[in-house]
């Protein structure tokens, strides 16, 4: 089994964890509808890069 040579200091531990933070997802605005969506994903209306790629589901308003 691997055994550490010396105890890891809090500084070294923090430096190792410095890249683990979550980042906000990059957002884009659909040019045709103005909807905000994640990059490389279709908008809620079914548009991607200015073209409608799928039909949006009709929502029942009750």
UniProtKB/Swiss-Prot annotation:
Family, per entry: Belongs to the bacterial ribosomal protein bL32 family.
GO function terms (MF aspect): structural constituent of ribosome
Transmembrane segments: none
UniProt-listed GO biological process terms: translation
GO cellular component annotations of the record: large ribosomal subunit
Domain of life: Bacteria
Stretch list, region Disordered: 28-62
Keyword Aminoacyl-tRNA synthetase tagged: no
Protein name: Large ribosomal subunit protein bL32
InterPro entries: Ribosomal_bL32, Ribosomal_bL32_bact, Ribosomal_zn-bd
Lineage, opening ranks: Bacteria, Pseudomonadati, Pseudomonadota, Gammaproteobacteria, Chromatiales
Alphabetically ordered keywords of this record: Ribonucleoprotein, Ribosomal protein
Organism for this UniProt entry: Thioalkalivibrio sulfidiphilus (strain HL-EbGR7)
């Amino acid at each position: 089994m691997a055994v550490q040579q010396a105890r890891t200091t809090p500084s070294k531990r923090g430096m190792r964890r410095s890249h683990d933070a979550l980042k906000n997802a990059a957002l884009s605005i659909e040019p045709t509808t103005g909807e905000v969506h994640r990059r490389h994903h279709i908008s809620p209306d079914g548009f991607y890069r200015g073209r409608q790629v799928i039909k949006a589901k009709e929502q029942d308003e009750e």
